[in-house]
A protein has these predicted regions:
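Conserved GNAT-fold acetyl-CoA-binding loop/helix
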Residues: 22, 26-52
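A short beta-loop-alpha structural element at the N-terminal edge
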Residues: 11-25
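Acetyl-CoA-dependent GNAT
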Residues: 42-98, 109-110, 170-172
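Conserved GNAT acetyl-CoA-binding A-motif
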Residues: 116-128
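Conserved acetyl-CoA-binding loop-helix of GNAT-fold acetyltransferases
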Residues: 101-114, 137-141
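Conserved catalytic-core motifs of GNAT/GCN5-like acyltransferases
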Residues: 75-78, 125-128, 140, 145-162
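Conserved beta-strand-loop-alpha-helix junction that forms the acyl-donor binding cleft
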Residues: 100, 126-136
Length: 176
């Protein structure tokens, strides 16, 4: 069992994600898939597909100072190709299972929200399985609010239908 004590901020840094970080990003995403409460996806995509799906700005990884290991990441995806929604993005955040509850999600959220606003994003949204209480709490702590509950939105490969809690954060700096 690992400790849930917050990691001293001197022990990690948050940096823009680069292509050479993607192997670790994909491994952390695969942990989320195996955990069963993070995504509908069955596997991580390759870099080219992932890179195409996500906005080029507001991509961050958490790296440990001592080893340079990637232990968390955050990225945004556009929600529509329509011009009126250019300032709306979906936020994805994943933390390595050994580092959950240590404050890395907080640090990533602060960076991700600030960067999104610097790039003109006025609304962030996230769809989260209701069983993923930790992620819901993290989002709420950073100003997201529940705006909907989508029942049986997607069917898992096992045949199980899963609900989604829709959370949204409206910027107080952009589009006000």
């Amino acid at each position: 069992m690992f400790s849930r004590e917050r990691l001293d901020s001197k022990l990690f840094r948050i940096v823009p994600m680069e292509e050479n970080d993607y192997e670790s990003v994909a491994e952390i995403f695969e942990q989320g898939i195996r955990g069963g409460n993070a995504t509908y996806d069955l596997r991580a995509s390759d870099w080219v597909i992932w890179d195409d799906k996500h906005l080029k700005h507001s991509r961050f990884v958490v790296k440990l100072m001592e080893t340079n290991a990637v232990v968390g990441w955050l990225a945004l995806s556009g929600v529509s190709s329509r011009a009126v929604f250019v300032g709306v993005a979906e936020l994805s955040i994943y933390i390595h299972q050994d580092f959950v509850g240590k404050g890395l999600g907080d640090a990533l959220m602060i960076h991700g929200i600030a960067s999104s606003e610097d790039h003109g994003v006025w609304t962030l949204q996230s769809g989260i399985f209701p069983e993923n209480v930790g992620s819901i709490r993290l989002h709420e702590k950073h100003g997201f609010r529940m705006v909907g509950y989508r029942e049986r939105l997607g069917q898992m490969q096992s045949g199980e239908w899963r609900d989604i809690v829709l959370l949204e954060r409206r910027s107080t700096r952009v589009g006000v």
